[in-house]
Amino acid sequence: MHIDTRYVTRYNINMIKSFAHKGLKEFYESGSKKGIQPEHAPKLGRMLDRLDASTSPQDMNLPGYRLHPLKGDKQDMWAVTVNGNWRLTFYFEGQDAYLVDYQDYH
């Protein structure tokens, strides 16, 4: 069978490519709250859905998320506020998010 590629639609899907936090990855993939603060689950779910659909850090600049770049040895990374001192951190390479982490870094 031969497919004429002139008529094939190609999709370039941007997405979260990697996680630094095992519990966050499990929450994202299965909904399990065992590796995260359970009270953060609703907001984390919204943030991860948004991040998965984002093509740049600026797509995460929503009211209440407090998007900000990190400094020092993490200068290529960005953070959004989950609750209190808890942050969702990530960096973009091209239009994909990498090393998505969930941490209390203050």
What do these predicted ranges mean?
Residues 1-13, 71, 78-106:
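Enriched for short, Lys/Arg-rich terminal
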Residues 1-47:
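Arg/Lys-rich, positively charged N-terminal/basic patches that mediate binding to nucleic acids
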Residues 17, 63, 98:
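Residues that recognize and position ribonucleotide moieties
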Residues 30, 50, 54-57:
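Short hydrophobic alpha-helical module
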Residues 46-49, 68, 88:
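N-terminal, well-ordered alpha-helical segments
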Residues 55-78:
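A short, surface-exposed loop/turn module that caps and links secondary-structure elements
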